[in-house]
Amino acid sequence: ERTHSANFLDYYIICLINGKEYDKAEDTLKKLLKTDDSNKDFLIDLGYIYQQQGKTNKSEECYGKAIKKIIPQNTAIINLANKFKNIREYSWAIKTYQQGRILLKKPDAFLKELGDCYLMERDYEQMMPLFVRTLELNPGSIDNITAQLSFARSNDIVNSIDPVIEKTLKSLCQKTDYLPVFDELAVWYNLQIRNYLLALQHAVLLNNKSENKLHIFLN
């Protein structure tokens, strides 16, 4: 009987999963879904149980159903994606954000969230354009972007991110709508790899473009 709050049910299911009582959790979720088949959280929980048991097809079916039930509401999309991220299903979180963009008719929605997911997937080729677009729309996010890149570099064992950053910076230099924030990004990166001469060159360029000539981007 569904006499308990939604929070109680969530914790109950989590306890069953953590205790590896998959059969009991599966039966409970199936009963709940019979009376509430639109509950995306239950679908993801059921999919996770299948995934833990190696039932990939059933798992993907549940995850796919959850995404199809998304409504065009920013909070609902973020909550569903967070549910996927909590179980480290970043590729499904990405699909959630992408579907959310379509529903909201906002192609630039969830830039940071998508970038963070690609970072966790170590898909730097997909990540960098999202970070660049974020800087284009909001140059003030440079500190957040460089912090994310620092995190990625510190966890990049095979040195696969630096070539992507360098390729991105090179392509940015060829843009007709080159922005000062790209110089900030270049200064930061070249300081990380100790290419001080190039860092200085970009710092001078940045200072020349600054409206406030007292702003000297040198330390």
Feature roles, as predicted:
Residues 3-4, 37, 71-72, 104-105, ...:
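Short coil turns that delineate tetratricopeptide repeat
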Residues 8, 42, 76, 110, ...:
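TPR alpha-solenoid repeat register
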